[in-house]
């Protein structure tokens, strides 16, 4: 037994995180909010302070990589002031002595092997670890003091998250060949959950395109927001993306943007479906039901999280 709890229980808890992100698609946090939050809360509570390690390993694993990135994107483009707390640890429990070892055992238990992992550069790898560890600590809000200035914390943390997304965008465009070095070249004969270099590159390209489209949409939709913190966030996002998204790109957006964005989203979904046709079916994975998002104004601001999930007192 390598952990503080029995290995079987530890492996199951880590496997839940892998399966959650394997199934996660764009806007789950918005369109399927209730079931997503409920599942996520259970996973974070079970992982405790190993949450950042789980995120790191799921990011590196090919079948869950896109889910982690789209989860982070959903947080980065959320107008709810409490959603950033989902990157923070839920509680102070440290359930595993060696979370990395438990993750590897979970991968073996679900049919994943060495050909299922990305190999980012050392610089990006260090940045990723630092980012996740930092957010695990700083995204926790003290109920006694933090709730009174959560809007300011929201802007600061969202800026940090967007800086990571920007770095991901630039590095994945520059160094993607090395990221895919360990993956199989052929599409046929892959192990369950594995992705070939071609399929994984196509998926990363889709994520990069989604990053640009959603960033432009967020900036254009909220630059004249009635809420000054949202306007400040737009200003910071524009600064981060200044060398990629020009003022002209934003200024040229018109009232038809929503229709155009919907068309792009449909096209992205179609391309993802085409990519997924090559993947092996994932039996027993979590499925999400679509829920009507009928949150109140306060719920919209604070992120509809329970007390122990969003904040730490």
Swiss-Prot record:
Q: Would you identify the family this protein belongs to, as annotated?
A: Belongs to the phytoreovirus minor outer capsid protein P9 family.
* Coiled-coil regions listed in the entry: none
Natural source organism: Wound tumor virus (strain NJ) (WTV)
UniProt key word Nucleotide-binding: no
* Tree of life domain: Viruses
Entry GO CC: host cell cytoplasm; viral outer capsid
At the highest ranks, the source species' classification is: Viruses, Riboviria, Orthornavirae, Duplornaviricota, Resentoviricetes
Please state where this protein is localized.
Virion; Host cytoplasm
Q: Which UniProt keywords apply?
A: Capsid protein, Host cytoplasm, Outer capsid protein, Virion
Taken from the record, one Pfam family name reads: Phyto_Pns9_10
Transmembrane ranges? none
Task: Supply the name of the protein.
Answer: Minor outer capsid protein P9
**InterPro entries, alphabetized:** Phyto_Pns9_10
> What is the stated purpose of this protein?
Minor outer capsid protein.
């Amino acid at each position: 037994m390598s952990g503080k709890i029995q290995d079987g229980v530890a492996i199951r808890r880590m496997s839940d995180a892998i399966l959650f992100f394997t199934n996660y698609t764009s806007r789950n946090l918005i369109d399927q909010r209730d079931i997503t939050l409920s599942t996520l809360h259970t996973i974070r509570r079970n992982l405790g302070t190993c949450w950042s390690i789980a995120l790191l390993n799921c990011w590196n694993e090919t079948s869950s990589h896109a889910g982690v990135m789209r989860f982070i994107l959903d947080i980065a483009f959320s107008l709810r002031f409490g959603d950033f707390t989902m990157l923070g640890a839920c509680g102070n429990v440290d359930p595993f002595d060696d979370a990395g070892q438990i993750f590897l055992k979970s991968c073996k238990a679900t049919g994943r092997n060495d050909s299922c992992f990305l190999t980012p550069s050392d610089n990006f790898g260090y940045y990723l670890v630092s980012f996740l560890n930092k957010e695990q600590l700083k995204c926790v809000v003290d109920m006694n003091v933090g709730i009174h200035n959560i809007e300011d914390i929201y802007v600061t943390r969202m800026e940090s998250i967007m800086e990571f997304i920007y770095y991901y965008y630039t590095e994945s465009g520059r160094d993607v060949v090395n990221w895919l070095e360990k993956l199989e070249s052929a599409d046929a004969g892959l192990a369950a959950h594995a992705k070939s270099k071609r399929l994984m590159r196509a998926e990363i390209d889709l994520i990069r395109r989604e990053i640009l489209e959603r960033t432009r949409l967020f900036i254009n939709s909220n630059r004249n927001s009635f809420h000054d913190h949202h306007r400040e966030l737009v200003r910071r996002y524009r600064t981060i993306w200044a060398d990629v998204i020009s003022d002209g790109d934003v200024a040229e957006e018109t009232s038809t943007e929503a229709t155009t964005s919907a068309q792009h989203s449909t096209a992205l979904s179609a391309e993802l479906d085409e990519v997924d046709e090559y993947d092996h079916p994932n039996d027993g994975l979590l499925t999400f039901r679509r829920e009507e998002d009928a949150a109140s104004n306060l719920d919209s601001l604070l992120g509809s999280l329970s007390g122990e999930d969003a904040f730490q007192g």
